Amino acid sequence: MTNYREIAWQGLWKNNPGLVQLLGLCPLLAVTATLTNALGLGVATMLVLIGSNILVSLVRDYVPKEIRIPVFVMIIAALVTAVQLLINAYAYGLYLSLGIFLPLIVTNCIIIGRAEAFASRNNAFSAAFDGLMMGLGFTLVLAVLGATREILGQGTLFDGADQLLGPWAKALTIQVWQVDTPFLLAMLPPGAFIVMGLLIALKNVIDKKLKERQPEVAVQPSVTRARITKVS
């Protein structure tokens, strides 16, 4: 029986693809200069994850093991193309901001990894839920990283939200503080590496505190039984 609570815990925290597995670092560090870009890439990746997991789960019994990886990549590429066309049609500004990193979702190790490790061994519903949780976990890391970099670099939050949600979303832009000169370190990839390292360190500290709160289980010493044979 599938443990959906464990799947959610793995995707959102314990085995988070961004903070623990450190997968998809190239787009994660390059695109997250603003919260809007981070959410756009995160949602696109999550949609591809869910779709690819479902399709891989449905065809897993019909694809020979020898060619499963090329088939999985073709499925992922088709879904990425569909998502790319949708963003191009309905969020052209975001499409331009994401640039080459949108089609590069095809090569994201998170997606092919979940297809191989989980979707190819479980039913479609469980695979879809796993894709949703892994996608949400990745999107949350992107969002926190993007929000932190945007606040430090520009002093704003949700700048350019109209690229993702339409003209009405311009009202969502928040001016946290007035910045005369942008803080370039936070907006460039080196700053992304620093913030990412701090997020990983924070997660490790939280995990350590949670582990210390758990009651220790007493380990019973093993008893070795000696066999005595009569010596004549």
UniProtKB/Swiss-Prot annotation:
Annotated family: Belongs to the NqrDE/RnfAE family.
Which NCBIfam families would you find in this protein's record? PRK12405.1, rnfE
GO BP, sorted A to Z: electron transport chain
List the keywords (alphabetical): Cell inner membrane, Cell membrane, Electron transport, Membrane, Translocase, Transmembrane, Transmembrane helix, Transport
The listed locations are: Cell inner membrane
Q: Source gene?
A: rnfE
Enzyme class, UniProt record, top EC level: translocase
Show the PANTHER family listed in the entry: ELECTRON TRANSPORT COMPLEX PROTEIN RNFE, ION-TRANSLOCATING OXIDOREDUCTASE COMPLEX SUBUNIT E
Q: How does it assemble?
A: The complex is composed of six subunits: RnfA, RnfB, RnfC, RnfD, RnfE and RnfG.
Q: What is this protein called?
A: Ion-translocating oxidoreductase complex subunit E
Q: Which cysteines are joined by disulfide bonds?
A: none
Q: Where is the signal peptide?
A: none
Q: What does this protein do?
A: Part of a membrane-bound complex that couples electron transfer with translocation of ions across the membrane.
**Top-rank taxon:** Bacteria
InterPro entries documented for this protein: NqrDE/RnfAE, RnfE
Q: Any stretches that span the bilayer, and where are they?
A: 18-38, 39-59, 69-89, 93-113, 127-147, 182-202
